[in-house]
From Swiss-Prot:
Binding site for a 1,2-diacyl-sn-glycero-3-phospho-(1'-sn-glycerol): R131
MF terms (GO), sorted A to Z: phosphatidylglycerol-prolipoprotein diacylglyceryl transferase activity
Locations listed in the record: Cell membrane
Lineage of the species this protein comes from: Bacteria, Bacillati, Bacillota, Bacilli, Lactobacillales
An individual GO BP term: lipoprotein biosynthetic process
Annotated protein name in UniProt: Phosphatidylglycerol--prolipoprotein diacylglyceryl transferase
Length: 259
């Protein structure tokens, strides 16, 4: 089993979970800052946005998780802020981040569609890296299986939880996000292939589809009325993405992302 603490300096402990999230963030910001000027948004605007959005997204992700696990946290109030032990919901972070983005664009008089198009691929790669924090914390895993011989030994060992090997759903989602990132990065280079806003719509449809399937394999998901909450949200993302693309294609005068 991998020690969840990467470094320890006196009373200060740095967890792998935090390092995975921060590594994903750094790469995401770098990619977004390089792309932003092509759409008339300065790199400084990306950095300023992240300084506001990232801490709020972490808080939003934690609040989302705690709300749907309130039956546990009402008895363990001291653990509500213990995010180093895991327990942040990606959808909570995404919803919070999107709201902050809209407010930021309104305040700075920026085009939110352009901002979302720039952010979407970066979010994908950040999520792909961040999921490895779940791996080290032994969370976000799937049902018990007899063996995982198709995986490297270090993954097999870490996925041996409560006396059984577990489906590495973290790995599936990480790979799915990485594949989506590669596809959209290649696609957006082609002139007149994507309208403004369709990169973001692709993210909604791609991520929503993958998450909808992968959530069905998990055993530790938050539930509501017998269905996993993330599956409700995933279905909603797919619907929003499809409606957005259909309406966008019917509108006249919409510019292409890459002319």
């Amino acid at each position: 089993m991998i020690n969840p603490i990467a470094l320890k300096c006196g009373p200060l402990a740095i967890h792998w979970y935090a390092l995975c999230i921060l590594s994903g963030l750094v790469l995401a910001v770098y990619l977004a800052s390089k792309e932003a000027p092509k759409k008339g948004i300065s790199s400084d605007a990306i950095f300023d946005f992240i300084l506001i959005a990232f801490p709020l997204a972490i808080v939003g992700a934690r609040i989302y998780y705690v709300i749907f696990e309130w039956s546990y946290y009402v008895k363990h109030l001291d653990e509500i802020i213990a995010i180093w032990n895991g327990g942040i919901a990606i959808y909570g972070g995404l919803i919070t981040g999107a709201l902050v983005l809209l407010a930021y664009c309104y305040n700075k008089v920026l085009n939110p569609i352009h901002f979302l198009d720039i952010a979407a691929p970066s979010v994908m790669v950040a999520q792909a890296i961040g999921r490895w924090g779940n791996f080290i914390n032994q969370e976000a895993y799937g049902k018990a299986v007899s063996q995982l011989n198709y995986l490297p030994s270090f993954i097999q060992k870490q996925m041996f939880i409560e006396g059984s090997y577990r489906i590495p759903t973290f790995l599936y989602e990480s790979f799915w996000n990485l594949l989506g990132f590669v596809i959209i990065m290649m696609w957006r280079r082609k002139p007149k292939s994507l309208l403004d806003g369709e990169i973001f719509a692709f993210y909604l449809i791609w991520y929503g589809s993958g998450r909808l399937v992968i959530e069905g394999m998990r055993t530790d998901s938050l539930m509501f009325l017998g269905i996993r909450i993330s599956q409700y949200v995933s279905a909603l993302l797919i619907i929003i993405g499809l409606i957005f693309v259909i309406k966008r294609r019917r509108q006249k005068g919409i510019s292409y992302y890459q002319e």
